[in-house]
Amino acid sequence: MSGAAARGDRLVGTWLLVICFMIFGMVVGGGHARTIGAGFVIQTWQPFTGIVPPLTHAAWERAFGLYKATAQYQAMQPKMTLAQFQSLYLPMFLDRDWGRLMAVVFLVPLAVFRLRGRISNRLTAWLLFLFGLGAGEATMGWYMTYEGMTSRILQPSPLYLGPHFVLAMLIFTAMLWTALTLRNPEPAILPGLARLRGLLSVSIGLIIATIGLGALVAASGALKVYNTFPLMDGHALPPHALAMHPLWLNFLANKATVQFEHRVAATVTAIVVVIAAAMGLRAPVGAKARDLFLLLAGLVSLQYILGMSTLVSGMAELGYVHELNAVLLLAACIACRHALRGATAAVPLPVYEMKAAE
């Protein structure tokens, strides 16, 4: 690859890293809006024209009037003032505008890079596919809001929030991997580390699955059902964990079961990631990769401590920090896995042994 082509790929990779940062920003904004209960406060859906918040007192009163008609307001917020409504409205509004900005930051550079021949047909198709997934992600978010406009539910459904978050993490994973590959196109050959590479792949899948279960806990209000650790009020498996019918409904809607699932998944994930980090720190992976494994070890330890603290305290705000650190943990695991993409199963024989074998 020529120097100019390599610089072009690095530039495209840097742009995709910006998109990854913006996806993380969506998690920051969306998680904050959910934590403060702002998911249903905006009762209009204007993806192209709603880029400016209400600017006059009359406009604010109209927006507040729409919210007053919702079941959430009538059941949970009947004494809310206009000032309180504004404090909820603006974080949700900024989250929506951040999504609009992300679409612009993605599509405009994509068109420019394409017109200048900086990206291939294959990469263009791949990025458009990821954009399509992002559009599906936005549609899923819209539907959760739409439910609050048209039905009597009081908060976004965990059955939508869980897949919504998982899809976001899958997009984040694919985007980050693509960015890292463009910035570092030549994998380092690392003999004998194929098992570690596979363990990191498993770790990525476990982290994403655990994040999805965490979203179920947050959306269903399961955080405060049991606030002891490691047992759940003295029980390994909580009573009534399988009380709902049909049986499968317990794993999605039973608060005790949902919290139990997340506890088990988090513990298994932490063990697997710690093993992967320990193997990486002992392996001949190079200084840069070693730093990544150190970061991975630190983040998984912090994540488990945050999870335990969130459970014991019952604080949704601490759970929000736990959620953000989960994305950082996922990013670190992806970076470690990417650094080992040139790992092979066999360790090559020394030259003299190869000659003797001949």
UniProtKB/Swiss-Prot annotation:
Q: What is its EC number?
A: 1.17.99.9
The GO annotation for biological process reads: heme A biosynthetic process
GO cellular component entries: plasma membrane
Q: What class of enzyme is it?
A: oxidoreductase
Q: Which cofactor does it need?
A: heme b
Q: How does it sit in the membrane?
A: Multi-pass membrane protein
Q: What are the recorded GO MF terms, alphabetically?
A: metal ion binding; oxidoreductase activity, acting on NAD(P)H, heme protein as acceptor
Q: Does the keyword Nucleotidyltransferase apply?
A: no
Alphabetical UniProt keywords: Cell membrane, Heme biosynthesis, Iron, Membrane, Metal-binding, Oxidoreductase, Transmembrane, Transmembrane helix
Task: Please list every transmembrane segment annotated in the UniProt record, as residue ranges.
Answer: 11-31, 98-117, 123-143, 159-179, 199-219, 264-284, 292-312, 315-335
Question: Where does the protein end up?
Answer: Cell membrane
Cite the Pfam families for this sequence.
COX15-CtaA
Catalytic activity, as annotated: Fe(II)-heme o + 2 A + H2O = Fe(II)-heme a + 2 AH2
Instruction: Specify the pathway.
Output: Porphyrin-containing compound metabolism; heme A biosynthesis; heme A from heme O: step 1/1
Q: Which InterPro entries match?
A: COX15/CtaA_fam, HemeA_Synthase_type2
* Annotated residues for binding of heme: 262, 322
Cysteine pairings via disulfide bonds: none
Q: How does it assemble?
A: Interacts with CtaB.
Q: Which family does it belong to?
A: Belongs to the COX15/CtaA family. Type 2 subfamily.
Biological function = Catalyzes the conversion of heme O to heme A by two successive hydroxylations of the methyl group at C8. The first hydroxylation forms heme I, the second hydroxylation results in an unstable dihydroxymethyl group, which spontaneously dehydrates, resulting in the formyl group of heme A.
Q: What is this protein called?
A: Heme A synthase 1
Gene from which the chain derives:
ctaA1
